[in-house]
């Protein structure tokens, strides 16, 4: 079986006065094994992070670095719920990928 691309998605909410600070940190952040990174603004203060990784092993290897990164930006985020805390993360193997180019 060949290595499959892997992705993680994290929903979060930024404090209004911390948006610029958050993106300053993100501009300097680079995780080894991550091939692409997207952040979508989904509401007034709501965001969704999508990371594309070479494979699940690359993602797992960066877990300590991702936790350290979250510790760095946690103060910029609002709690989503008491159960979730400040992030709502999911991850998994990419099972479908379609590229659309200038149709």
Where are the predicted features?
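Glycine-rich beta-strand-turn "strand-cap" elements at beta-sheet edges
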Residues: 1-7, 11-13, 35-48, 72-103
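Low-complexity, intrinsically disordered short peptide segments enriched in small/polar/basic residues
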Residues: 6, 16, 22-23, 47, ...
């Amino acid at each position: 079986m060949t290595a499959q691309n892997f992705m993680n998605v994290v929903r979060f909410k930024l404090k209004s006065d911390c948006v610029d600070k958050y993106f300053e940190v993100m501009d300097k952040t680079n995780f080894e094994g991550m091939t692409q990174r997207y952040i979508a603004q989904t509401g007034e203060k709501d965001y969704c992070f999508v990371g594309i990784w070479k494979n699940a092993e690359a993602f797992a290897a960066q877990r300590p670095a991702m936790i350290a990164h979250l510790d760095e930006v946690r103060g910029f985020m609002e709690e989503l719920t008491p159960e979730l805390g400040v992030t709502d993360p999911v991850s998994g193997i990419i099972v479908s990928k379609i590229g659309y180019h200038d149709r």
